[in-house]
Amino acid sequence: MTDLDLDWQLEELENGRLIPESNVVELCQRVRDILIEESNIQWISSPVTICGDIHGQLHDLLELFRIGGSCPGTKYLFLGDFVDRGFYSVETFLLLLTLKCKYPKEMTLIRGNHESRQITQVYGFYDECVRKYGSANVWRYCCEIFDYLSLGALVDGKVFCVHGGLSPSISSIDQIRLLDRKQEVPHEGAMCDLLWSDPEDISGWGLSPRGAGFLFGADVSEVFNRANDLSFIARAHQLVMEGYKIHFSDKDKQYPKFTNEEDSELDSDSASPVDDSPAPGDIITIPEKDKGSVVTVWSAPNYCYRCGNVASILQLDENQTQSFKIFGTASQERSGIPTKRPIADYFL
């Protein structure tokens, strides 16, 4: 293999410029060699910052790094769904692969349901690769990388991280380690469920309206957590307007928010109602007594450039303290949204 200038690649991709196809080939070969040595469940030590769906929103990914810290100073775990729907899936995925190549221990990437040949041919990544590179070659290289991504991660042996959720076929994390992950995402079975399932306020298991995976209730997650000695499950997969969600908590309440700006002093007579919705700059720490058995992290602000949601990253310290850092979309000058361009059908 020839030497890759990873710093040059990072600069090009961060500025929304494509790297040559020959660089993509070598980058994918190098990352494949790294991933093939990784387990189905990657062990990660805290502190770590956990990130949810990105969906090709490159400039919002750069905003995430701005507020979360640059790698390798900050250790990152991304929960999949790097591509599709956004305008810059190619640059987004290649940027993350370049970081993985340069900092393999500080950048962990696991598979989402959109890291799939079938799904990317429907929701945009395939078409984007063909449009930007003139053929489907880059898409094929990336799809091979999809097959080698881990299915989950375990932080300090206490926090199970997965893209979607649980499976009725899986009662222990050791069972996940035995799965053959180096394949296209199956239409059913344990591997499919891990990438597609969702928590829901039901008892036991339910059919998923997605047509893949399952819905699972608080009782299911509590049994799984107890059997595997887990504190909680961290997952992504679902748009959350507030950027994060605590599932199956005994407490339904607003949590204290801390901003980087000093709060203004208001006397009681002049105080006006306060909007308790999370806002960019807020840091929300969940009290131990109010933790749920499952949390959702969503990291694509203003999803599809029209949903109006904020996003979050989950910062875990050595005690598994949950601190959600809220952020919004990149400024208009840096957002990179093409102008005078119709929204493709797959956004609707």
Swiss-Prot record:
Its cofactor is Mn(2+). It is an enzyme of class 3 (hydrolase). Its EC number is 3.1.3.16. Binds 2 manganese ions per subunit. Its main location: cytoplasm. One of its GO terms (biological process) is signaling. The modification Phosphoserine is found at S272. Residues 269-280 have a biased composition (Low complexity). It catalyses: O-phospho-L-seryl-[protein] + H2O = L-seryl-[protein] + phosphate; O-phospho-L-threonyl-[protein] + H2O = L-threonyl-[protein] + phosphate. The active site is at H114 (proton donor). Mn(2+) 2 binds at D81, N113, H163, H237. It comes from the Eukaryota. The keyword S-adenosyl-L-methionine does not apply. Disulfide bonds: none annotated. The keyword S-adenosyl-L-methionine does not apply. It is found in: Cytoplasm; Nucleus. Residues 259-282 are annotated as: Disordered. The modification Leucine methyl ester is found at L348. InterPro entries: Calcineurin-like_PHP_ApaH (IPR004843), Metallo-depent_PP-like (IPR029052), PPA2-like (IPR047129), Ser/Thr-sp_prot-phosphatase (IPR006186). Belongs to the PPP phosphatase family. PP-1 subfamily. This is Putative serine/threonine-protein phosphatase C26H8.05c.
